[in-house]
Amino acid sequence: MLPAALLRRPGLGRLVRHARAYAEAAAAPAAASGPNQMSFTFASPTQVFFNGANVRQVDVPTLTGAFGILAAHVPTLQVLRPGLVVVHAEDGTTSKYFVSSGSIAVNADSSVQLLAEEAVTLDMLDLGAAKANLEKAQAELVGTADEATRAEIQIRIEANEALVKALE
């Protein structure tokens, strides 16, 4: 909890009141209309996976940590890291996708847009190849002194570690 001295600073009180007003406004429609729907759009440069589909929940990996998104989620904009995106449909089924990177926008109207640099369903990936690529990248990292090359190899390692984790 903030000390009282901080709350008396000019401008800070307005910020706190604004946040409370938003939270109250966001909670009011949910109570009045029952469960909200979430409109989900998920695409990569080569494929559209969902276009305005009503889904129950989406789990995403971001640079600040993985989190789940439900209807009426707090608006946010996040950068995706390599990992597993899980989409929970209204009927209880789940779809799993591996994304390399991208962004996700969660809007106040319960619409969500996930734009991935690369995205594939898990059945299109090979665990053996991912493990081999991971081992190769780890071996290359040991003998590399150039910082730019080390950074590129580290990205390959991170992506392949996420692939292996998603497939195991």
From Swiss-Prot:
Keywords: Acetylation, ATP synthesis, CF(1), Disease variant, Hydrogen ion transport, Ion transport, Membrane, Mitochondrion, Mitochondrion inner membrane, Primary mitochondrial disease, Transit peptide, Transport
Protein name per its UniProtKB record: ATP synthase F(1) complex subunit delta, mitochondrial
PANTHER family per UniProt: ATP SYNTHASE DELTA/EPSILON CHAIN, ATP SYNTHASE SUBUNIT DELTA, MITOCHONDRIAL
Gene, per the UniProt record: ATP5F1D
Listed Pfam families: ATP-synt_DE_N, ATPD_C_metazoa
Record-linked InterPro entries: ATP_F1_dsu/esu_C_sf, ATP_synth_F1_dsu/esu, ATP_synth_F1_dsu/esu_N, ATPD_C_metazoa, ATPsynth_dsu/esu_N
Transit peptide, residues from-to: 1-22
Subunit comment: Component of the ATP synthase complex composed at least of ATP5F1A/subunit alpha, ATP5F1B/subunit beta, ATP5MC1/subunit c (homooctomer), MT-ATP6/subunit a, MT-ATP8/subunit 8, ATP5ME/subunit e, ATP5MF/subunit f, ATP5MG/subunit g, ATP5MK/subunit k, ATP5MJ/subunit j, ATP5F1C/subunit gamma, ATP5F1D/subunit delta, ATP5F1E/subunit epsilon, ATP5PF/subunit F6, ATP5PB/subunit b, ATP5PD/subunit d, ATP5PO/subunit OSCP.
Gene3D superfamilies documented for this protein: ATP synthase delta/epsilon subunit, C-terminal domain (1.20.5.440), F0F1 ATP synthase delta/epsilon subunit, N-terminal (2.60.15.10)
Localization (cell): Mitochondrion; Mitochondrion inner membrane
Sites of N6-succinyllysine modification: 136, 165
Clinical note on disease: Mitochondrial complex V deficiency, nuclear type 5: A mitochondrial disorder characterized by childhood onset of episodic metabolic decompensation featuring lactic acidosis and hyperammonemia accompanied by ketoacidosis or hypoglycemia. Chronic manifestations include developmental delay, easy fatiguability, and 3-methylglutaconic aciduria. The transmission pattern of MC5DN5 is consistent with autosomal recessive inheritance.
Signal sequence segment: none
Family: Belongs to the ATPase epsilon chain family.
GO biological process terms, semicolon-separated: aerobic respiration; mitochondrial proton-transporting ATP synthase complex assembly; proton motive force-driven ATP synthesis; proton motive force-driven mitochondrial ATP synthesis; response to copper ion
UniProt function note: Subunit delta, of the mitochondrial membrane ATP synthase complex (F(1)F(0) ATP synthase or Complex V) that produces ATP from ADP in the presence of a proton gradient across the membrane which is generated by electron transport complexes of the respiratory chain. ATP synthase complex consist of a soluble F(1) head domain - the catalytic core - and a membrane F(1) domain - the membrane proton channel. These two domains are linked by a central stalk rotating inside the F(1) region and a stationary peripheral stalk.
GO cellular component, one term: proton-transporting ATP synthase complex
Residues carrying N6-acetyllysine: 136, 165
Single GO MF descriptor: structural molecule activity
